[in-house]
């Protein structure tokens, strides 16, 4: 199939999405989270995993490796796809988010301007000011076995801008 036969022409009123990755790096029973800088437009002062936009020449797995290395300085292993979100934020463009977990043998992290990195015990993570979807998804992810298939999640927002997460069965 040629590039022109892929059906990527959005003039037919199709909904476009931006691909992103989100990664949770584990070391023992701790999870690496970033407290986003107060000057950030998206999720200032809130805790989230690391990640970002998938570049045009990347696949989701390569992007996850790159984002982890860029934002933490860590080399990781056992990078596993845990969830795929389809996010409808009531705009012309949505987001497809690939959520990964990874293991790190090191706790030596690099500073960056995105925020501050913190190793947080898994059993106390819900006590932090997390990005709004994490209290819903992290318990599922932490309970997964390495061979479990990824979760598929549709995320939307109601008229009061409250999040709704629907997990595929």
Q: What are the roles of these predicted feature ranges?
A:
Residues 5-32:
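Conserved N-terminal beta-strand and adjoining loop/helix that marks the start
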Residues 11, 82-89:
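Short, solvent-exposed loop/turn elements at beta->coil junctions and helix N-caps
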């Amino acid at each position: 199939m040629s590039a022109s036969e892929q059906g990527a022409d959005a003039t037919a009123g199709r909904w476009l999405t931006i691909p992103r990755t989100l990664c949770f790096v584990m070391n023992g029973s701790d999870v690496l989270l970033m407290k986003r800088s107060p000057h950030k437009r998206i999720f200032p002062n809130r805790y989230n995993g690391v990640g970002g936009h998938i570049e045009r020449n990347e696949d989701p797995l390569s992007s996850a490796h790159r984002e982890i290395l860029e934002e933490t300085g860590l080399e990781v292993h056992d990078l596993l796809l845990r969830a795929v979100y389809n996010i409808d934020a009531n705009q012309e463009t949505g987001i497809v988010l690939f959520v990964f977990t990874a293991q790190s043998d090191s706790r030596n992290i690099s500073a960056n301007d995105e925020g501050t990195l913190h190793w947080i015990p898994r059993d106390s993570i819900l006590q932090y000011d997390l990005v709004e979807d994490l209290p819903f998804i992290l318990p599922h992810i932490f309970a997964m076995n390495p061979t479990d298939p990824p979760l598929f999640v549709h995320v939307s927002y109601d008229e009061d801008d409250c999040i709704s997460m629907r997990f595929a069965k």
